[in-house]
Amino acid sequence: MLRTSPVTHNGSINLIKADNDLVIAGYASVEMVDKQGDLITRGALKNAFGDFMKADGYRNVQLAHSNIQVGSVIPSYTDSDGRVWKSGVDDAGMFVVIKLRDDIEKAREVAKEIRKGALRGFSIGGQAFKRMRKSDASHGDYTEISKLELHEVTICEKGINPEATFRILK
């Protein structure tokens, strides 16, 4: 597992607050057929996430795919109870730890909306390079994405992947 503290396996994100910082953590994508009929494989997520994390200045977190950077994916975070949360891809999916900015008004607005419960989901943005139409009894008809480039993680009301949601850890 990527973290030392328990996390629900229903895709929920836990909010961790330290000082004036706002840090959230949870699954931004899990391997399942999403609302658009796409299934991103864990292998694709693992490769794309590895490349994404190599350039620390470009680990973009946006609001609703708006091109406004409101935070950054960070490698890990230790909460006030001493639990370590780590970004990476595990058996459930792509788990991210995100530190929100507090130096711009839009990021402060996002933090406020998270605390109010208005923003509850994650989505990811990128470019798919390898897609294949598939069909099986458990998933029906879907498009499997086995290679992609990850450009950003976005915070939104509801993501396309229903398991990419969060709750506040109090």
Positions of PLM-derived features:
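Signature of dsDNA virion morphogenesis modules
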Residues: M1-K170
